[in-house]
Amino acid sequence: MSRLSIATTERYTKDFRVNYIDTDLDSPINIKTVLTKLGVLALFRSLSEGLCGLSIRSTTDDRFMLINSNNNIGRQHFTVAHELYHLYYGTNTVPHICRLGGKEPEEVNADSFASALLMPEKGLIQQLPGEEYRSGKISMATLLRTERVFGVSHDALLIRLLKLHIINDATYQQFKSVTITSEAARYGYDTSLYRPGNNGLYIGTLGEMAKKEFDRGKISEGHYLEILNMLPNERQEA
């Protein structure tokens, strides 16, 4: 698929908000709640460096994703939204693997979708003080607060602001160079959004999906029992 226009990407995110998760067009979303609502099974595990996650949609429309818990929480939220693009707007059912810095058209499309889904333009602008928005001189305090409102990483917010022409490249480079955990702590914020986490978490009903695959003959009885035995040791969020 070729690279989508900005207008098409925005149309996809609006369609997703209205028709899939039944929410308004501008409010922040809780990405974990979205996964539960959609019935997408998500597992958070330690994966190789440079690997953000993977996803697959079965021929029977079951959807699954694996997210790298070594990345910071904000990055994980972005990866989930990125994989939702592949699961709902992608064209094949083979496993999709997401790596940092992917430049293929569909990877760029998925990144644009994730950015617009997590940080809708109107909702984002509403978070910015009027004078800062009009001048393009966004303060560190505003950045930190907005990152927490939308549950996104520092880099993700800066890129979104730059692409919306709210900040210029000089401002982008200025704020990109900071150590965000130190800045967050200096302003009195919890820094967990900027650190790894969620290892061992799963969202959804892993047991039900495993049984469906067992009943279809897709996994062996031994594998099915192994999954069931694993569940009490995992941290579930459903």
Regions found by a protein language model. Give the residues of each.
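Active-site hotspot residues in diverse enzymes, especially metal/ion-binding acidic/histidine motifs
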Residues: 1-238
